[in-house]
């Protein structure tokens, strides 16, 4: 049962990340098909989904014990069809306002919010010894949605797929592209994911609890410490994923970045899974500490690769260092998430037993607080997806 729920969750979460980061590919191509948005506006479109995704992760982190994992996964996956359909029609009309694109980009953020409920739900299915690995697989393979989207979308827009309304657009260079396909290609898969979640997942009775029972987790000091640590790792990963293509386009305009953009998120997503598994063996604290040192090193090196006075910079060095940042931000995302699961489970068990509670109550409270903490901390981490592209 646990494995089946995990793999359906991975599929739905992967699709959520595909929708969440749609504008990292779409924004790069908007001005090619007749729009006249400024660079700042395009960066804003890539960043806005992270704002709504982060804010929505707060309520999403509490919904699983209230509605059940099966029901919520099906609902939260199904509603992502709305921004995909809308975006597909919007990009075909060059008169579509920037405000409309802002609204659609905010709706895409619902895909990012799914992470909080998905991770919280999976935490109920696995014991402490396997939580790091399970959460790493769910989060890491779910994060693959970013690289899957950045790989598939450029291919999808290069040819007509949906004959019923696929008129395509002519770029400023005279080429034809079908930008709507970047959004519409996910609709059938979202429908499949919705049905798979509804008929294949489970609502655990042990996972049921009210919002009032979950809110005390916000009073735990460890929650805010771990939120900052997670912001530095996952916030970096999602921020880099959102802004990497646009940053490369501004710094190295001769490079066709969409041929390479998916590599970074792909490396980071796989590294996240590895980070959780490694942390189960060596301890999340040790892995996270070493990882932070490496992240700082790569961040410092990045500045040396950019164009500046008297030199054109080096795209090869820029790309290599950025891949190092994707790798370490992915590893750190997995290791910090493993720390959250271990810390809150341990603290809650000790607190309940100190208050005289029995083992059954302690286990139930530990699962509830761990789930709520995982979701809320993920909300803080997602804010990096807004701030990092804005700094570019």
Model features per residue range: what roles?
Residues 78-94, 293-312:
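C-terminal ends and interior cores of transmembrane alpha-helices
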Residues 4-35, 149, 240-245, 388:
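Extracytoplasmic
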Residues 23-28, 220-269, 273, 333, ...:
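Extracytoplasmic gate region of multi-pass secondary transporters
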Residues 97-113, 313-333:
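Hydrophobic core of transmembrane alpha-helices in multi-pass small-molecule transporters
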Residues 44-62, 262-275:
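Central cavity-lining transmembrane alpha-helices of secondary-active solute carriers
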